[in-house]
């Protein structure tokens, strides 16, 4: 190859060879963006996996059963509230006068809704329930707390009768949830306060106390210096009873109520 040809060949380069070397060594824009893009895609993928994982967990998780609530969700959900146990002078009679007994009865009635806490439930076969109470042409059930109150009042009423030395005839005049009271309101019932009924109330209330399992801490009885407690002054975490009472009253079967 002649020197002239070699010179000519080199002159045909539009750019000097050094320019290509610089361009080859310069990092491309894609090389700079690649880590950012990969990181972003990985982050989006992680978020999607997390989202679907949470969604799947929520879809398959069973709703937790509310403490002391109704298993099937047929009764409203009532909030918990702090309640200080206080003495109520009308909670028990003086065991002497009819006036005092009537005042106590009315005091207890204030905790009972109209209809005594019986409600109607449709399509009972869809739920986990015991056989319904057939009354007023409907399938009905008793809300437990009002049955419990009724039982406790029944025991106290018998105690009043014994304390006042009532006759056996008078013992047959009290109302209960066990026997038919009238054709108009078959859910209102009359019962002779026999041993069977009182024994039932003792057992039922014991079961209710065991179910509630109240673990509030109770302190010294303020009425005496002797070691002991009457339960007053302790703070308990309770359901909103006013809410329960209003809920039951709004779904009553009849307007009458009794202890």
UniProtKB/Swiss-Prot annotation:
Membrane-crossing residue ranges in chain numbering: 36-56
Motif stretch (HXXHC 2): 197-201
Catalytic class of the enzyme: oxidoreductase
Pathway connected to this protein: Mycotoxin biosynthesis
Annotated localization: Membrane
One CC-aspect GO term: membrane
The protein, known as: Oxidase ustYb
Annotated source species: Aspergillus flavus (strain ATCC 200026 / FGSC A1120 / IAM 13836 / NRRL 3357 / JCM 12722 / SRRC 167)
């Amino acid at each position: 190859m002649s020197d002239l040809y070699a010179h000519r060949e080199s002159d045909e380069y539009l750019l000097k060879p050094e320019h290509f070397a610089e361009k080859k060594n310069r990092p491309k824009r894609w090389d700079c963006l690649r880590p950012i893009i990969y990181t972003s895609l990985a982050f989006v993928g992680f978020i999607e996996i997390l989202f679907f994982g949470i969604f799947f967990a929520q879809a398959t998780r069973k709703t937790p059963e509310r403490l002391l609530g109704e298993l099937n969700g047929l009764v409203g959900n009532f909030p918990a509230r702090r309640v200080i146990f206080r003495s109520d002078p009308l909670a028990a009679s003086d065991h002497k006068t009819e006036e005092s007994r009537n005042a106590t009865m009315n005091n207890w009635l204030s905790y009972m809704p109209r209809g005594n806490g019986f409600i109607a439930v449709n399509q009972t076969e869809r739920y986990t329930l015991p056989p319904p109470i057939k009354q007023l042409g409907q399938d009905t059930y008793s809300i437990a707390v009002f049955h419990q109150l009724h039982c406790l009042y029944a025991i106290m009423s018998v105690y009043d009768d014994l304390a006042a030395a009532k006759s056996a005839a008078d013992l047959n005049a009290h109302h209960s949830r066990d026997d038919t009271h009238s054709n108009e309101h078959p859910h209102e019932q009359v019962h002779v306060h026999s041993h069977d009924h009182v024994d039932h109330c003792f057992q039922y209330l014991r079961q209710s106390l065991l179910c509630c399992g109240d673990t509030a801490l109770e302190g010294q009885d303020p009425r005496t210096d002797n070691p002991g407690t009457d339960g007053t002054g302790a703070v308990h975490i309770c359901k909103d009873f006013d809410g329960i009472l209003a809920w039951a009253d709004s779904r009553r079967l009849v307007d009458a109520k009794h202890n």
